[in-house]
Amino acid sequence: MKQSKGSRNYVFYAQHPEKEEEVPSWHEIKQTPVIMATIKGPGPAKYLRSSCTGYIAHDISMFQEPAYSLHTRHTKKRIIDINSPGPCYFLNPKVTRFGISTCPQVPMEERISNPRINCMPASCKYNLEKTRPSGERQPPQYTFGYRCPYRVMDPNPAPNQYQLPVTLGTNIPVFRAAPSYSLASTNKNWFHKENIAGGPGPAMHTRPEPSVYQNRSPLFSMAKRFGCPLDHTHRPGPGSHDIQPVTVHKPRIPAFTMGIKHSPHLCPLIVDICD
C-alpha cells in the first residue's frame, strides 16, 4: 500500500513505541501483525503480598496484633541454688531511678601539716660520695625498697556474701505475686476408694449361663467352608510372550510417527453444532 499524504508510523498499544523515523512518501511500508499471545508478562507469583505474620514488613492494610517475645526457660538450679551472684550484680542502694540519693558527706582524712614548712630535702640530704662520673662504665645495680604493707583487713562482709531474695513464689513481701494453689494428698476418708471389707465385690463373680438353670435350646455346629478344587498347573504369563517377531504374519514391525510441535497461538477449530 502506498502513502499519499506524508508518512505515518502505526503504534500498537501492546508494545512500547519505537523511535519515529522519517520514511519517504514513495516507499511502501510493510506492516507485521502483532500476536497478542506472544507478549508475555509476569505471573501472579511475581507480585508478592506483604506478610501478615509478625511485625517486620507487615501489611499496612491489615491490623497488627501485639507481639510477645519468647525467652529461654529457667532451669531449676537457678531457683534452688543457694549461691548468690558475683559483685558485678550488686545493686547500689544509693542509685534510684531519679539519680543518686545521698546525704551530705564530709571526707575524713589525715591532718594537714604546716604549709609554711618546706618539705623539700636540703642539700645535705644528698650523698654525692657514692655517685660515679657519668662517663664511667659500671655494672647494673638494683635497689631494694620497703616491703609493701598488707591490705587492711575489713571486718565487713563482701558483696558476694549477701544472698538476693528469690523473685519467684508468694513468700516475698516486696513483690506483687499471683495467687498460688497447693495440691494436697488424697483424702482417705471415702469408703469407695478403699477396700474396707477386704473381700471381692459382685463384679468379681461371673454370671452363669441360662442353660444351666433353664431348658437348653438346640445347638448347631458351624464347620468351615471347603474350598473349590482349583487347577494349579503352571501357565505362562504376559511377560513370557515375545511380541517383537511379528514379521511372520506382518511385513514390518509397528512404528510410531512423531509429528511437529504445533504453535501455542494456533486457534482451535470450533464447529457450531445446531441441535
Curated annotation (Swiss-Prot):
InterPro entries: CIMAP, SHIPPO-rpt. Keywords: Repeat. The keyword Acetylation does not apply. It holds the Pfam family SHIPPO-rpt. STPGR repeats lie at residues 200-225, 236-261. Belongs to the CIMAP family. This is Protein CIMAP1C. The gene is CIMAP1C.
